[in-house]
A protein has these predicted regions:
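Domain-level recognition of soluble alpha/beta enzyme cores
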Residues: 19-82, 301
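Short beta-to-alpha linker loops that shape the active-site pocket of alpha/beta-hydrolase fold enzymes
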Residues: 45, 111-115, 288
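Residue in the alpha/beta-hydrolase core beta-strand immediately N-terminal to the catalytic nucleophile
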Residues: 156-158, 227
């Protein structure tokens, strides 16, 4: 299924090339809006050298094969900004970012401050506009590195993201949020996992945010197309909020009606967001569930998660 997701975005953004292991570099990027640096990663077509590594591997998840420190091929390459989900990290989308790099893209991803695995504050992490600032800063950083900028094609810049990162990609493409519309949904919606009641239980307070921040446009005119996998925050969003969105949009939904996560269901039976993008390319991956977009789990992964009281992210529907 993950290969299909990568292929779907490749059709939108990248012309596939011969697949060699992706080159990889860890980078630090200044994020003045956070008052600190953020960790990032470059994934790129390699031309030799580097140390073979399984990036992001741990007791629960298998890692992603990369060549750490490999030489970068000549380019120029399209640039893709990648955004992980709330509480995720760079490695959580490693299968996708490495796959895009192997296919001929220069990909940059960051650990979003306040909303990553070991740096998490829900109230701060829900300030979705800081995530667009993160990726804008990453793109600015890339453009300021002469050796990297020479290999980048800045006429082909794209954004991709998963869950909260899916919203980040859409917002960079011009979509605007609707705080009161989202809050109204929370007042009328039945309790459902990972949505309103769960946010409140975890200590989030939607009334603490200002519409001026939540609803403001965050479009970056350098973005030519976006792909969003199970994007969050689409409740309350109407056609007026999408009027500045780039034309080339790929929406990927995970699961059928029985297995879709309500918080990220953009279908007619969910937020209905899909009806406001008549020109978008829509793909549904089933059988699947929201967490099917995470890396492949190891055999002992479910037991480790259960012992730690963590979310059952390894419990994919049969046949996934």
């Amino acid at each position: 299924m993950k290969h299909l997701l990568a292929a779907g975005f490749l059709l939108l953004a990248v012309q596939a090339a011969a697949a060699e292991p992706a080159g990889f570099r860890s980078v630090a990027i200044s994020a003045g809006h956070h008052g600190r640096d953020m960790s990032g990663a470059l994934w790129y077509p390699s031309s030799g050298g580097g140390e073979a590594n399984s990036y992001g591997e741990n007791g629960v998840f298998f890692g992603t094969r990369v060549l750490d420190g490999a030489q970068m091929a000549e380019g120029p390459f399209p640039v893709i900004l990648a955004s992980h989900g709330l509480g995720g990290n760079i490695g959580a989308l490693g299968w996708l970012t490495a796959g895009l790099a192997e296919a001929g893209a220069l990909v940059i991803s960051v650990n979003h401050p306040n909303s990553t695995t070991r740096d998490f504050n829900l109230q701060e992490g829900l300030k979705h506009w800081t995530r667009t600032q993160d990726l804008r800063a990453a793109l600015d950083w890339l453009a300021a590195q002469p050796d990297l900028a020479a290999r980048a094609d800045f006429s082909r810049v794209y954004a991709v993201g998963y869950s909260a990162g899916g919203w980040t990609a859409l917002a960079l493409g011009g979509l605007r949020a609707n705080l009161w519309g989202y809050a109204a949904r929370c007042e009328t919606a039945p309790p459902s996992p990972w949505q309103c009641a769960d946010l409140t239980r975890r200590g989030a307070d939607l009334t603490a945010y200002s519409p001026e921040d939540w609803d403001a446009g965050r479009k970056d005119d350098r973005i030519r197309a976006v792909a969003a996998i199970d994007p969050a925050l689409t409740y309350g969003v109407g056609r007026v909020h999408a009027r500045d969105l780039v034309e080339r949009v790929l929406l990927i939904g995970l699961g059928n009606r029985e297995t879709r996560l309500p918080a990220t269901d953009f279908s007619a039976t969910g937020s209905g967001f899909v009806s406001h993008l008549p020109a978008a390319e829509i793909e549904t991956m089933a059988p699947a569930a929201h967490f099917s977009a995470l890396p492949a789990c190891k055999p002992r992964g479910p037991a480790i998660l259960a012992a730690e009281g963590d979310d059952p992210v390894c419990d994919d529907p049969p046949g996934t």
